[in-house]
Amino acid sequence: MREFGSASWRDIVRWRANALEIVLYMDAPPSGPSYLGLLARHIALLTAITEEWRELETSRMPPSAEWVATQLAVLLGKELHTAFPDYRTLLARAVENPTDSAVQAKVYALVLELLKAAKAHNAQRPALLLAADHLASHLGSQDERSPEWDARRRALRIDGLTWHWSQLGASWFYAHDLLWRIWKEYPASPWGERAFVRLLDLGWDTSVGCQKGSDQFREVIRQGEAFLARRPMSPARAEVKFLVAQSYETWWSLSQASREDQYADPARYQDGATTARQKAIAVYKDVLGLVPTGPPSTYARRVLPRLGLGFPTNQRRFFCVYD
C-alpha cells in the first residue's frame, strides 16, 4: 500500500512483524529541508479502515446494517413466490422510491391482500403476516394530516397495524405490531424465529422517539443470549449472534466516547465495558465460523483488529438518539 505523500521519500527501510510495519525514510520535499521520518502502522487495521471508507462512499448504509432485512426479503420472496410473485419487486421499488404515490398505492393494496390471505391460510399465516409487516414498514406519509393516508391507516388499524407521527422525522412510522404478534403467537415456528430476529434488528424497540430508552444494546444482548441458550442450533443463530456482537461492540464504543460527545456519556458505560469488548470479539469470531462470506463476515473482519487493539469503533448500532 503506497503511503500518502511518499513521492519524495528516499532510502526507505521497512521492518515487518506479523501485522505491524515500521518504515524509516528520508524525505526530501521540493521545498524545505530534508528530514528523517518514522512511520508505524497496523496493516490489518489500516486495510479495514480503507475498505470501510470506500464502502461508505458508494452506499447510503453499510450492507451489514441492512443484512437482516435483506435476508428476510429473500426468504419471504421464495416462500410466497407462487401466490405473490411480485412481492420482492414491489418491496425493492418501495425501498428505492419511498415517497412515490403510485408505489405507495401498490404497497397498500398488497398489504391488504397479504392480510386477507393470512386469515384464510393457517399453514402460511405466520409467513403472510411477516410479509405484510415487512412491506408495511415502507408504507407511510410525510403529510401529518393527509386524508388519503388517514383513510388507509384506519383500514389497516382493523388488522392491528398502527402508525405514529414522528415530529422530528416529519413522517408516519409503522410500529411493527405484526412482528410482536407473530413472535407471541408462533414462537416455535421458523417464521416466529424470523420475527424475533427482526425485532432484535430493530433494537427490540419499535416505538418512535426511543421510548424504551437509549441503551437498546442491553435488551438486544439479554434477548439474544436467552434465545441462543434455548435454541443453540436455530437456523437463525448467525443473525442473532451478529446482532449480539454489534450490541457488545456498541457498549464498548460508548465507554470510549469522547468527553465532547453530545449524546453518550462514557462514564455511564465503563462498568462491564472490558468484558463487552472481549465478548464482542468472541461472538464476531463465531459469526465468521457460521457465515464465512457476505456482509456480516466482511464487517467482522474489519472491526476485529480495532477491538483486538482496544480501539473505539464508534459503533452506535443499538444506541437510540431522538434529536
Predicted feature residues:
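Acidic, polar-rich low-complexity tracts and alpha-helical solenoid repeat scaffolds
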Residues: 1-323
